[in-house]
C-alpha cells in the first residue's frame, strides 16, 4: 500500500508540535538547574530523615445547617400590596423594636458577681479591699501648653514646690496605657477607691459595663524577656488582671464610694437606676429606681454627703434633683425637685454643708441651691450665673469653691467661702454681681461626638493648703489646676493614644487617672 504524501498544512502542524515540545523540554531543564523544581529524592535520604513527612489531617465533612429559605410571596399566592404582607412586615418590625427595647430596660433584680460577670478574673470578697490658654476648638495632639519653663518662672515658693511635686507624677510603669483596657466601650465615669493602701480604680462605660483595676499588681517576672528570647510569643507578656461586670443596661454616668462605707460602690445609670455593689459580699442590689421599668428617667449625676453614708442624691437628664434615704424600704419616699427645664449635666454637694448643691445645666447656667429652703412648686436658687454656652459640670471642693467647665471653652472658679457660705441662713440670696466667677481659665472643651464631656474633679481631701482639681485636655493630657486658677501640672506620657477625657483624683493621695473613648486608662502616681 502506497503511503499518502502529507499535505502542506499537516506538515506545518507537526512542525509546530515538535517546536513546542522542544521548548517545554528546555524550560523544564532550566528550571531544574535553578532549583525551582527538584527531582524526587529516594527514600531513606538525609533530607527525608531530617524532615519526616507528616500525615495530612483527616478531612471532616462539615454538615451545613438547614436554614429556612426565603420564599417569594408571589409564588405563595400573596399579592404585593395585600393586607397579609403588610401585617407580616409590621409584625417583624415590632418584634425587632421590642428586642431593642428589652436590651435597654433596666434589671431590678439583685445580682451576684457571677450574674453580672463579663470577663477578667473572678475575685473573692476581700481581693479588692485588702486594706493654659488653648486655641478655641482646636486640638493639637501632644502639644504641651504647660511645662518646665512655667515651673522655673514661678515666684511663690509654695506654688513652685507643688508644681514640682505634681509634675513629678509618672505613668504606671507596669503596663502602657494602651494595654489597660478596663471597659469594652467608651468610659463615661470613674472613681478611685478611698483606700490609701493601694490604688483601685472603677470605671463605667457607655453600655453599662463596670471595670475594676487593682493597680498594686506587678507584672509577672516571666513577662520580662531576655535579649536572647526573641522568638517569645505574645502570651509570655500578659495584660494586667482586670474585672469587668455589667450591673446596668445603659451608660454608667456617675459613681461614688463613701469613705465611711468603703466596701460599697454606688453607680448611677441612664437606665434610671442607682445600684449598690457590695465588694465584700460580691453582690449588686438596686437601691433606687422609678416604680415601673417602663419609666425612662436617665440619671446624670450621683453624690453623697461626707457625714451621711445612708442618703444618696442624684440629678436627671430631665432637669430633676432627688434625695433618698436608703434605710427606708419604700423608694416612693424619695424627694424630688424640678430644678431645670433642660438637662442637668452634673452636680455636687458642699461636703461640709451638704444642704448646698451646685448644678450645671444645658440651659447655660450654674446654679447654687439651699435644700433647707427649696420649694417643690417654685424652687428658687441662692444665685445663678449664666455662661455663653452649655455648662457641663459644677464641682464643689471642701472649702466652698466651685469649678465649672463649659462649652464656651472656659473653666470658671467661684469662691463662696470668702462670701461666708458656711454662715448663711436659710433664704439667703446672692445678687448677680456676687455670682460672677472669681477666676476664668481658657480651656478647650470642644469634645465633639466621640469624646466624653470634660468635667473638673477636685481632690476632696488634699494634704496641703492649696486646693487642686484635674480635667482632661484635648491634646491628650490631663491638666491640674489650683483653686486660684494656676496650672500646677500637665500629665502625659508615651503610649497615650487617645484623649483621657474622664479625669479623676484620689481623694487624698496624689494619684490621677484618665479614661479614654476606647475604654483604656492612664494612671499617674
Curated annotation (Swiss-Prot):
Q: Which GO terms describe its cellular component?
A: chromatin; cytoplasm; nuclear periphery; nucleus
Which biological process annotations from GO are given for this protein?
DNA damage response; regulation of DNA damage checkpoint
Where is composition skewed (Polar residues) in this entry?
A: 34-50
| Keywords, ordered alphabetically | DNA damage, DNA-binding, Repeat, WD repeat
Q: Which SUPFAM superfamilies match?
A: WD40 repeat-like
InterPro entries xrefs = WD40/YVTN_repeat-like_dom_sf, WD40_repeat_dom_sf, WD40_rpt, WD_repeat_DNA-damage-binding
Q: Does the keyword Repeat apply?
A: yes
WD repeats by residue range: 182-223, 247-287, 339-379, 384-425, 448-491, 494-525
Biased-composition ranges, Basic and acidic residues, are 83-102
Pfam families tied to this protein: WD40
Give the Gene Ontology MF terms in alphabetical order. DNA binding
Q: Which Gene3D superfamilies match?
A: YVTN repeat-like/Quinoprotein amine dehydrogenase
Instruction: List the biased-composition ranges (Acidic residues).
Output: 227-239
Disordered: annotated segments: 34-103, 214-240, 282-301
Which PROSITE patterns does the UniProt record give? WD_REPEATS_1, WD_REPEATS_2, WD_REPEATS_REGION
The UniProt similarity line reads: Belongs to the WD repeat DDB2/WDR76 family.
Annotated function: DNA-binding protein that binds to both single- and double-stranded DNA. Binds preferentially to UV-damaged DNA. May be involved in DNA-metabolic processes.
| PANTHER family the record matches | WD REPEAT-CONTAINING PROTEIN 76
Its protein name is DNA damage-binding protein cmr1
